[in-house]
């Protein structure tokens, strides 16, 4: 097996927590476990002390409109390392830096399209209208993805978006989740009051996640109590919405929890509700199902392949609160149906592992390096185990 030196460039990383962070962290760990040398290039955080030698922190500034996020502000001295290949995960300053370095050093550049960027334009005043008038966001993304040697996306639902950017032959590789951490979670006190039906939803409390629709649905299930695991800018709005619905006493905003404990909350839930229609994949759906929790979710883009519809859960049309309520009520009132879907959910949720995903990514690397498939993957017995990175969970999708 040939060992590579790989640079993973990402504009969001620990201590941030979201789907991209989870994806990059798991990929880095598994590539190292298969014998490759990996360096994650990410923004620094003023109060975060980096303890891992495989993470290169780049100077950053605070986002004007998103004060909890950092925007990398790289200089030439930040990039004295050399790689056999660069893999970018975001189209901002570090992603574009990775693209330029690959071109300068004449090495392959692989890019993963994790996020439907236009859906997040509302975070920057004027960006949505600028995109509508000029296509600025799409053109910037096309600069990165259209010039990559290979493009990966987690779901087939993103293929049309990439083709609109004139990306040729994108490869679908699902983002993995690490079952070891979820399944080994220590017991935690139940956040659900005794005697209530236990409904869970997980994610960053942000407008595009549409947790207001989840509240609307649970308001129509009088014996249910909703737990929201995650934090974000919409918390005050969602709490006020719960008050308006007269259900403030039936909702618990759990906030941030250590990643090692998250599996314990999934394990206690009876049902997972999710209403976001902007997901590239919806990792939380996979996590819930891995822990045996049936899912009722909006079917749109990435979530269309995130649930085995009718077996591990149900997908409903965008914005259809009545359908969310109908399927939730059916699952909670029929023990035999719930048991069957719980068993199917465990099987479906375990369908992607970090090892399998890394092997698929390594085959993409081999292709752009003009090597035969399998050249870069270690035999199973040759893998070395690495402990998952410790991290705190603030909500990802």
Task: Say what each PLM segment does.
Residues 22, 197-220, 233-239, 322:
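A conserved mid-protein helix/loop that constitutes part of the nucleotide-sugar donor-binding site
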Residues 42, 56, 131-185, 194:
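Donor nucleotide-sugar binding/catalytic pocket of nucleotide-sugar-dependent glycosyltransferases
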Residues 120, 300-310, 314-315:
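Short acidic/histidine- and often glycine-rich active-site loop of Leloir-type glycosyltransferases
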Residues 145, 256-257, 264-269, 361:
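Short alpha-helical donor nucleotide-sugar binding micro-motif in glycosyltransferases
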Residues 239-257:
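Nucleotide-activated donor-binding/catalytic signature segment of Leloir-type glycosyltransferases, i.e.
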Residues 277:
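Aromatic "clamp/platform" in nucleotide-sugar-dependent glycosyltransferases that forms part
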Residues 285, 294-298:
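Short hydrophobic beta-strand element within catalytic cores of glycosyltransferases
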Residues 308-310, 314-321, 330-335, 350:
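Conserved acidic donor-binding segment of nucleotide-sugar-dependent glycosyltransferases
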């Amino acid at each position: 097996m040939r060992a590579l030196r790989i640079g993973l460039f990402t504009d969001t990383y620990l201590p941030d927590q979201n789907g991209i962070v989870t994806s990059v962290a798991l990929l880095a760990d598994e590539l190292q476990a298969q014998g490759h040398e990996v360096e994650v290039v990410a923004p620094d955080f003023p109060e975060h002390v980096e303890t891992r030698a495989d993470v290169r922190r780049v100077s950053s500034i605070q986002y004007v409109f998103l004060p909890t996020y950092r925007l990398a502000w790289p200089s030439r001295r930040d990039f004295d390392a050399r790689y056999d290949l660069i893999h970018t995960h975001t189209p901002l300053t570090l992603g574009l830096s990775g693209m330029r370095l690959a071109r300068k050093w004449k090495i392959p550049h692989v890019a993963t399209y994790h996020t439907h960027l236009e859906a997040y334009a509302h975070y920057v005043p004027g960006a949505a209208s600028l995109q509508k008038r000029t296509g600025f966001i799409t053109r910037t993304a096309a600069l990165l993805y259209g010039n990559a040697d290979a493009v990966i996306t987690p779901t087939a639902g993103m293929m049309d978006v990439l083709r609109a950017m004139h990306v040729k032959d994108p490869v679908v590789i699902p983002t993995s989740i690490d079952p070891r951490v979820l399944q080994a979670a220590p017991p935690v006190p139940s956040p659900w009051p005794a005697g209530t039906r236990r409904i869970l939803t997980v994610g960053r409390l942000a407008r595009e996640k549409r947790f207001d629709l989840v509240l609307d649905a649970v308001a129509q299930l009088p014996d249910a109590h909703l737990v929201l695991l995650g934090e974000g800018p919409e918390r005050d709005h969602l709490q006020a919405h719960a008050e308006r619905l007269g259900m403030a006493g039936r909702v618990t905003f759990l906030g941030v929890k250590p990643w090692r404990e998250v599996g314990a909350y999934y394990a206690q839930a009876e049902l997972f509700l999710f209403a976001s229609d902007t997901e590239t994949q919806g990792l939380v759906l996979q996590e819930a199902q891995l822990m045996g929790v049936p899912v009722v979710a909006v079917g749109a883009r990435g979530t269309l392949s995130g649930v085995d519809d009718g077996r591990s859960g149900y997908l409903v049309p965008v914005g259809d609160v009545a359908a969310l309520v109908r399927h939730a009520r059916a699952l909670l009132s029929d023990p035999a149906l719930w048991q069957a879907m719980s068993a199917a959910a465990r099987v479906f949720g375990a369908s992607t592992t970090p090892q399998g995903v890394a092997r698929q990514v390594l085959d993409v690397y081999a292709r752009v390096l003009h090597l035969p498939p399998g050249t870069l993957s270690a035999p199973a017995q040759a893998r070395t185990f690495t402990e998952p990175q410790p991290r705190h969970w603030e909500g990802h999708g």
